[in-house]
From Swiss-Prot:
Statement: the UniProt record of this protein carries the keyword Endoplasmic reticulum: no
Top-level taxon of origin: Eukaryota
An MF annotation (GO) of this entry: D-cysteine desulfhydrase activity
Cofactor(s), by name: pyridoxal 5'-phosphate
Keyword Repeat in annotation: no
Location of N6-(pyridoxal phosphate)lysine modifications: K51
The protein's Enzyme Commission number: 3.5.99.7
Free-text function comment from the UniProt entry: Catalyzes a cyclopropane ring-opening reaction, the irreversible conversion of 1-aminocyclopropane-1-carboxylate (ACC) to ammonia and alpha-ketobutyrate.
Family, as annotated: Belongs to the ACC deaminase/D-cysteine desulfhydrase family.
Name of protein: Probable 1-aminocyclopropane-1-carboxylate deaminase
GO BP of this protein: amine catabolic process; cellular detoxification
Keywords: Hydrolase, Pyridoxal phosphate
Top enzyme class: hydrolase
């Protein structure tokens, strides 16, 4: 079985590179070697990111089914919606985006710059909604689908993070297949993999991919949702479904989902002092940009784990960089005095 049975529409450049983060590793004491899997530069479509990889397995259904409009949802600074909008433009499809008010952040430019600006540039129909943050299928999303159907359109639903779609986890099983090949080229295996998680399908796909070789407990998910119980339950559900799809013989349980909840505070989309410090440190040592919503918090978690010797000395750690830097301009107030 495996991934070969599923159609895949090419939207990425191919296997994403793994780069050594030597200066960051040295700055943190040199006891652990840090590497990055660069999903942040995986495509030429509106800066790419992890959702592009997932969409490669969803888009064949949209094309084969004759759908004319991609419909997706996220927060105002959603990476997901920006990537869906770019894919729609690339394919010549219409696109409707529901941008809910998930983040309690007051800035007059928040809904004008960053991801949402890029979505408008690629001609998506961007609709602001006052609903607050949660995971799962949202009423505003259902309403948009019903409205478009009544108007004679054929909308293709792409839920937040692609995570509620049955194929949402497949893309990151493919990411792990790339990692296995890259480990052979590098001549070593990674001891730990660190990845951000909110809606869960990136993390879930990596768990399933690593479970193919019994290494799923080496994956650390850094929660950025601030709703860790819901996130963990969703990750497990997606992982179990994805495992069945690819024919994984092992049954995954809650013990296979390792989520670190210490870095999501104070809320989804709001960085803490450690998040900003992590963004600056990663940028200053490596020239690699992370964002205040997702990757800044997972980078914060990685830095904390290394600094506090929570990862064994001599380990090689792979940080999965999921993208998200376009959101930085929406949070410029955090960096104005740097």
């Amino acid at each position: 079985m495996g991934l070969e049975q599923f159609k895949k529409y090419p939207l990425t450049f191919g296997p994403t590179p793994i780069t050594s983060m030597k200066r960051l590793s040295k700055t943190l004491g040199g006891k652990v070697e840090i590497f990055a899997k660069r999903e942040d530069c995986n495509s030429g479509l509106a800066f790419g990111g992890n959702k592009i990889r997932k969409l490669e397995y969803l888009i064949p259904e949209a094309i084969d089914g004759g759908y004319d409009t991609l419909v997706s949802i996220g927060g105002i600074q959603s990476n997901q919606t920006r990537q869906v909008a770019a894919v729609a433009a690339h394919l010549g499809l219409d696109c409707v985006l529901i941008q809910e008010d998930w983040v309690d952040y007051k800035d007059t430019m928040y809904d004008r710059v960053g991801n949402i600006e890029l979505s408008r540039i690629v001609n998506a129909d961007v609709r602001l909604d006052s609903s607050k943050f949660d995971i799962g299928i949202r009423p505003s999303f259902k309403n948009a689908l019903e409205e478009l159907t009544k108007k004679g359109k054929k909308p293709f639903p792409i839920p937040a993070g692609c995570s509620e779609h049955p194929y949402g986890g497949l893309g990151f099983v493919g990411c792990v297949e790339e990692i296995y090949e890259q480990e052979k080229q590098l001549g070593f295996k990674f001891d730990k993999i660190v990845v951000c998680t909110v809606t869960g399908s990136s993390f879930a796909g990596i768990i399933v991919g690593m479970a193919l070789t019994g290494r799923q407990k080496d994956v650390i998910g850094i929660d950025a949702s601030a709703t860790p119980e819901k996130t963990k339950a969703q990750v497990l559900r997606i992982a179990q479904n994805t495992a069945k799809l690819i024919g994984l013989e092992k049954e995954l349980t809650e013990s296979d989902v390792n989520i670190d909840t210490r870095f999501a505070h104070p809320a989804y989309g709001i960085p803490n002092e450690g998040t900003i410090e992590a963004i600056k440190l990663c940028g200053a040592t490596e020239g690699v940009l992370t964002d205040p919503v997702y990757e800044g918090k997972s980078m914060q978690g990685l830095i904390h784990l290394v600094r506090n010797n929570e990862i064994a000395e001599g380990s090689k750690v792979l940080y999965i960089h999921l993208g998200g830097a376009p959101a930085l301009s929406a949070y410029s107030a955090y960096f104005k005095n740097t």
